[in-house]
């Protein structure tokens, strides 16, 4: 009987040690709906793969800074990552369409743009050893300003928060000084008096409690930037077929869920933003 028990234990041991572990890096805080969606994605993968693949989500720039994540995943320093798509514009120009003002004015428009972008982005990422999994938009971008804005002249000599080449160019055209500030550091930068305005989602304003310093919000719906989630292609190919299928299926579900979460955030943030002194 003891022999049978030992044989059974040895037979199970390889299964117990067969789990693959991935690190997924993101630059956004754990409370962000994007990160919560990532955590759900990771849980879905682990469950669907029967524990064969476990994905550990590292939020808040803890593993790599947001703009470093694509390179880190490409080099295999992390197996998966998330970044804002406009960070890819240098190597993937069509990703920059996300930050062209007033081309996209609704979630339906944003979905049509993603349908056009997706095959091209997937192909270009594949050429760099990356596999695109899914993309989810932020709520539309509005304008936060410490002082009222009546014309473009009001930006001259001020400091505008920027986070991609598109916002840098907008700041320059308005005569403002671009200030690169990650989303997780917005409140700190405002408290230190480093910013006068920023174009970002109302959600970012709510999450950072910016109304302590910023008194004006304009819902201009300038664009709908997307975050994209991707994996190292070699790491993906090394998975057994059932685990690969689990990743693909969970990614499709995460995309659907993420778009719904983004739209829901619009209603939430507009209810949460103070009715005054915002205009």
What are these model-predicted stretches?
Residues 12-13, 33, 278:
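Alpha-helical transmembrane segments and their juxtamembrane interfaces
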């Amino acid at each position: 009987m003891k022999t049978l028990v030992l044989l059974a234990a040895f037979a199970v041991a390889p299964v117990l040690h067969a789990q693959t572990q991935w690190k997924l890096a993101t630059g956004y805080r754990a409370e962000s709906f994007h990160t919560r969606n990532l955590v759900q994605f990771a849980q879905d993968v682990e469950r669907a793969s029967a524990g064969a693949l476990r994905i550990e989500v590292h939020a808040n720039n803890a593993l790599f800074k947001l703009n470093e994540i694509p390179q880190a995943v490409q080099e295999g320093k992390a197996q998966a990552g998330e970044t804002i798509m406009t960070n890819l514009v240098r190597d993937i120009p069509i990703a920059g369409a996300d930050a062209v003002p007033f081309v996209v004015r609704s979630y339906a428009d944003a979905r049509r743009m993603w349908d056009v972008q997706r095959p091209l982005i997937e192909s270009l990422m594949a050429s760099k050893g990356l596999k695109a999994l899914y993309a989810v938009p932020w709520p539309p971008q509005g304008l936060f300003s410490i002082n009222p804005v009546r014309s473009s002249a009001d930006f001259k000599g001020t400091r505008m928060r920027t986070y991609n080449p598109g916002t840098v160019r907008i700041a320059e055209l308005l005569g403002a000084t671009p200030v690169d500030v990650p989303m997780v550091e917005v409140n700190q930068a405002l408290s230190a008096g480093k910013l006068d305005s920023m174009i970002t989602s109302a959600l970012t304003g709510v999450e950072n409690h910016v109304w302590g310093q910023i008194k004006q919000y304009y819902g201009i719906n300038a664009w709908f930037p997307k975050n994209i989630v991707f994996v190292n292609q070699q790491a993906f190919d090394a998975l057994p077929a059932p685990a690969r299928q689990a990743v693909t299926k969970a990614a499709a579900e995460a995309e659907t869920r993420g778009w719904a979460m983004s739209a829901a955030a619009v209603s939430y943030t507009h209810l949460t933003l103070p009715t005054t002194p915002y205009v």
